[in-house]
Regions:
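Short, hydrophobic alpha-helical membrane anchors of single-pass surface/secreted proteins
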Residues: 11-14
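Bacterial Sec-dependent signal peptides at the C-terminal "C-region" and cleavage site
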Residues: 25-37
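OB-fold and OB-like single-stranded nucleic-acid-recognition modules
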Residues: 36-287
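N-terminal secretory signal peptides that target proteins for export/translocation
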Residues: 1-9
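Bacterial N-terminal signal peptides
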Residues: 16-27
């Protein structure tokens, strides 16, 4: 799907640096649990001291004071490349059109393209990966192999290096083949701690045991390295292209004793009722 031209993004980002921070703080009084609203471009406002959504959140978020009151859209680094990376990781505003369906091979092909074009790890200007698709709103069906809080000891730049579970991402390991135990063949989704719904936890995600449909912002995470041959770096993955941040998690309701067959059925279904939001699944289980 089309994304905003690079020149427009640069113009918005440059303009943001001269807008008083007070504008970015205008929505600070939003009540917890209510979607926030504001300008339509998630990369347009530079926030240093707090995080305030600059568009309507794609989920019913709850303000997370431990992070949202202390860490803005561009994270905690002074490095322009890390700031640009953080702004991309914090883009909650990509859902302007129906999502593009992504498949495992698409993410592998994007990885090959990035390697062919020798995309550097440090990207002060993310135009090269935006041309490949970063910034698109995408939909991906897979099985969750593992979900856990990441970087809890020291935090990471996008979250202002704040340690702890409440201030860091949930890393989701996604398998295209539910019978494959090797995480080197996995792909990745990340749930941001900003305005994270309380029910979006590793425990709830790991308990699903059904195919999930994850939608969100397509992102190139050049700070890591994919598995290659005997090289198995952590976190293990087949592609640096991931969904980050996650906008929604839905659970497939189709039943099939064959895990592969069940996942394939869920990928191919066109019935809206076959997908139920995570919160509704958890609510029905409680009742």
């Amino acid at each position: 799907m089309p994304t905003a031209p690079r020149t427009n993004r640069r113009r918005l980002a440059n303009a943001a640096t001269v807008i008083p921070l007070a504008i970015g703080l205008a929505s600070a009084g939003l009540p917890g649990g209510q979607p926030a609203s504001g300008p339509s471009d998630g990369l347009a406002i530079v926030q240093k001291g707090s995080f305030n959504p600059v568009c309507t959140l794609p989920f019913a978020g709850v303000r997370n004071p431990a992070l949202d009151d202390r860490c803005g859209i561009q994270g905690g680094s002074s490095d322009p490349a890390k700031q640009a990376e953080s702004r991309a990781k914090n883009n909650f505003c990509a859902a302007k059109q129906p999502p593009k369906n992504m498949f495992y091979q698409d993410l592998i092909d994007l990885q090959k393209q990035a390697e062919k074009e020798k995309v550097p790890k440090s990207l002060p200007d993310r135009g090269a990966v935006e041309k490949m698709g970063e910034g698109e709103y995408v939909s991906y069906v897979a099985m969750i192999k593992d979900a856990h809080y990441s970087d809890v000891a020291k935090g990471e730049a996008v979250n202002c290096n704040l340690p702890g579970e409440v201030t860091n991402d949930i890393h989701i390991v996604l398998m295209s083949d539910p019978t494959d135990p090797d995480e080197c063949n996995s792909t990745t989704a990340e749930i941001s701690p900003h305005f994270r719904p309380p029910s979006w936890t590793p425990a709830n995600l790991n308990a699903l045991k059904k195919p999930v449909r994850i939608r969100g912002h397509l992102f190139y995470d050049g700070s890591h390295t994919p598995c290659r041959g005997t090289s198995r770096p952590n976190p293990k993955r087949a592609s640096l292209w991931e969904i980050h941040p996650v906008y929604s998690v839905e659970v497939c309701q189709k039943e099939n004793r064959d895990p592969k067959g069940n996942l394939e059925q869920c990928r191919n279904t066109s019935r809206a009722e076959d997908w139920v939001p995570l919160d509704e699944v958890l609510s029905s289980e409680r009742n």
